[in-house]
């Protein structure tokens, strides 16, 4: 179980971290309820304007992440899956870890204003806060592997060039999605 310090550390974080955290919450909820994450955002925006509700306003950066991740979901999932070990599938990853990876990979690929190191560190922090003790390490390895080939991925490729570091560390990393299709 996470310590009280770890659970409340997000309160000391900046607005971007809180927006990422809210995006993870929304993507997680959308997958668990099998609904469109953009619809959840729209509902939360309406609810936050009503008197007598405890629903907080949705930060604009959360809206940007959620709408971007929803629009690019297939590509994000392909890219994440391309970096998993052969015996792992995207569905095998915990739902919360998928949400964290989708937010972090979206930032890596589609928001060049966020430094790569920041997107990686924030993803690892979210995994530390939300997930198991082993999740931060494999989230870090996967995001680092993607960051090493960021120019190819930003140009539209989903085939990783290399991922030996994460694989050598024993984390679930796959050589290439092209190998799976042959």
UniProtKB/Swiss-Prot annotation:
Q: Which UniProt keywords apply?
A: RNA-binding, Transcription, Transcription antitermination, Transcription regulation
A GO molecular-function annotation: RNA binding
Sequence segments annotated as region (Disordered): 159-182
Q: Note the SS bond partners.
A: none
Q: Could you give one GO CC term from the UniProt record?
A: cytosol
Looking at the Swiss-Prot or TrEMBL record, what is one Pfam family this protein matches?
Answer: NusB
GO term, biological process aspect, one: DNA-templated transcription termination
Q: Which Gene3D superfamilies does the record associate with it?
A: NusB-like
Organism domain of life: Bacteria
The role this protein plays is: Involved in transcription antitermination. Required for transcription of ribosomal RNA (rRNA) genes. Binds specifically to the boxA antiterminator sequence of the ribosomal RNA (rrn) operons.
State the family it belongs to.
Answer: Belongs to the NusB family.
Q: What is this protein called?
A: Transcription antitermination protein NusB
Q: Which organism is it from?
A: Corynebacterium diphtheriae (strain ATCC 700971 / NCTC 13129 / Biotype gravis)
């Amino acid at each position: 179980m996470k310590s009280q310090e770890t659970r409340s550390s997000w309160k000391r974080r900046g607005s971007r971290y809180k927006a990422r955290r809210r995006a993870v919450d929304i993507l997680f909820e959308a997958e668990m309820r099998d609904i469109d994450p953009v619809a959840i955002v729209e509902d939360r925006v309406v609810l936050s304007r009503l008197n007598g509700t405890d629903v907080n306003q949705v930060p604009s950066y959360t809206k940007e992440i959620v709408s971007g991740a929803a629009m690019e979901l297939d590509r994000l999932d392909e890219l994440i899956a391309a970096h998993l070990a052969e015996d792992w599938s995207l569905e095998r990853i915990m739902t919360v870890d998928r949400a964290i990876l989708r937010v972090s990979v979206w930032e890596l690929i589609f928001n060049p204003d966020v430094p790569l190191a920041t997107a990686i560190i924030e993803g690892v922090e979210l995994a530390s806060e939300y997930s198991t003790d082993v999740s931060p390490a494999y989230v870090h390895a996967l995001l680092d592997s993607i960051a090493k080939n960021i120019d190819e991925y930003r140009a539209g490729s989903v085939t990783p060039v290399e991922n030996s570091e994460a694989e050598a560390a024993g984390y679930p990393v796959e050589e290439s999605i092209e190998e799976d299709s042959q």
